[in-house]
């Protein structure tokens, strides 16, 4: 009996053919059946896929193929289209016709310098548009109103027009870093149409001041690696929902009195690698701030009430991280009670000045 059972199992193994990987998506299995979609003569749409691209589960991958133009024969039910790392120079009208179900379009790292104003018109459900690392000098016109995420960092954008974001009420995230943008190139009211914006990054540009008119809905603003020299109170006015402000690697010498009062819900303030001469005023009165990065500045003294309110602490939250290393002030010159409202001493990083 045992010999018969072993023979039966061996026979089953011998009938099974070797595994043959047919494509990148072999491991992306459907909920039912295998990961390979069989040809169905009654439904020719299943077999439609641009030459050399890979199509699976409404995802079309045409990346890293050296393409110089957008292919034309996409399955009409495509929801994600990946065209990154090619040599596409232009997006023409009709390039995405019939892709009414497309949610994500990835065009990163091409050579795109021109986009037709009608190119995105068919994309009535588009939520994510990735155009980073191209040669765009301005933002595309008539972007879909369904858009939630726009990434255009590392292009050649020099101006933001008021019309660029008109009607984009659903956008939550914008990435604009790595463009040769200046304050003079940002039109008054440029951000006015962004009613739901939560996150914006304008880092590594040529701006010298915090852009005016940022949406009040913002919770994170990242302006690292620019040429900002000071933070004045009006530049933060209205940002009542802001919880994180990144200003690292600028040339800031002062944060004006009253600036922090305009961001009452701020929890993280990154001011490291600037030229600050003193600790920003208003930290002690701020109820919610927990993280303050001030390392690698020119701070030569720290007052006893710079971080904690005089007398009994009235803060809602304790500091979880305060960095002061890389400043001229010596740690032994700082009074022990300076951080009396910090309950975990390991949160304080002093270090030495080089």
Curated annotation (Swiss-Prot):
The attached glycosaminoglycan chain can be either chondroitin sulfate or dermatan sulfate depending upon the tissue of origin. Residues 1-16 form the signal peptide. LRR repeats lie at residues 68-88, 89-112, 113-136, 137-157, 158-181, 182-207, 208-228, 229-252, 253-276, 277-299, 300-329, 330-354. One of its GO terms (biological process) is negative regulation of endothelial cell migration. It is found in: Secreted, Extracellular space, Extracellular matrix; Secreted. Residues 17-30 form a propeptide. It comes from the Eukaryota. InterPro entries: Leu-rich_rpt, Leu-rich_rpt_typical-subtyp, LRR_dom_sf, LRRNT, SLRP, SLRP_I_decor/aspor/byglycan. The keyword Secreted applies. Disulfide bonds join 49-55, 53-62, 308-341. GO terms for molecular function: extracellular matrix binding; glycosaminoglycan binding. The keyword S-adenosyl-L-methionine does not apply. It holds the Pfam family LRR_8. One of its GO terms (cellular component) is collagen-containing extracellular matrix. Keywords: Disulfide bond, Extracellular matrix, Glycoprotein, Leucine-rich repeat, Proteoglycan, Repeat, Secreted, Signal. Glycans are attached at residues 34, 206, 241, 257, 298. May affect the rate of fibrils formation. Binds to type I and type II collagen, fibronectin and TGF-beta. Forms a ternary complex with MFAP2 and ELN. Interacts with DPT. Belongs to the small leucine-rich proteoglycan (SLRP) family. SLRP class I subfamily. This is Decorin. It comes from Mus musculus (Mouse). The lineage of its organism: Eukaryota, Metazoa, Chordata, Craniata, Vertebrata.
């Amino acid at each position: 009996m045992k010999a018969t059972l072993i023979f039966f199992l061996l026979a089953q193994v011998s009938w099974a053919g070797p595994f043959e990987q047919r494509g990148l998506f072999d491991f992306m299995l459907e909920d039912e059946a295998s990961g390979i979609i069989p040809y169905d003569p009654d439904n020719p749409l299943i077999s439609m896929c641009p030459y050399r691209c890979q199509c699976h589960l409404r995802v079309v991958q045409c990346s890293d193929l050296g393409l110089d133009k957008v292919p034309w024969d996409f399955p009409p039910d495509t929801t994600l289209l990946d065209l990154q790392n090619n040599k596409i120079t232009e997006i023409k009208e009709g390039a995405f016709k019939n892709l009414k179900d497309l949610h994500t379009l990835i065009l990163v790292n091409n050579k795109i310098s021109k986009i037709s104003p009608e190119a995105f018109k068919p994309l009535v459900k588009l939520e994510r548009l990735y155009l980073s690392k191209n040669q765009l000098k301005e933002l595309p016109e008539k972007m879909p109103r369904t858009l939630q995420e726009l990434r255009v960092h590392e292009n050649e954008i020099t101006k933001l027009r008021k019309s660029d974001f008109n009607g984009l009420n659903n956008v939550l995230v914008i990435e604009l870093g790595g463009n040769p943008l200046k304050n003079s190139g940002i039109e008054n009211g440029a951000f006015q149409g962004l009613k739901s914006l939560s996150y914006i990054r304008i880092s590594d540009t040529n701006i010298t001041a915090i852009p005016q008119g940022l949406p009040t809905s913002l919770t994170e603003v990242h302006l690292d690696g620019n040429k900002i020299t000071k933070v004045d109170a009006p530049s933060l006015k209205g940002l009542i929902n802001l919880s994180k402000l990144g200003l690292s690697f600028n040339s800031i010498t002062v944060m004006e009195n009253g600036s922090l009062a305009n961001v009452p819900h701020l929890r993280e303030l990154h001011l490291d690698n600037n030229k600050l001469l003193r600790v920003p005023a208003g930290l002690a009165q701020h109820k919610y701030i927990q993280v303050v990065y001030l390392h690698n500045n020119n701070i030569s003294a720290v007052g006893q009430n710079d971080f904690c309110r005089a007398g009994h602490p009235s803060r809602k939250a304790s500091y979880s991280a305060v960095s002061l290393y890389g400043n001229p002030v010596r740690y032994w010159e700082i009074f022990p009670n300076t951080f009396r409202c910090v309950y975990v001493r390991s949160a304080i990083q002093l270090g030495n000045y080089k």
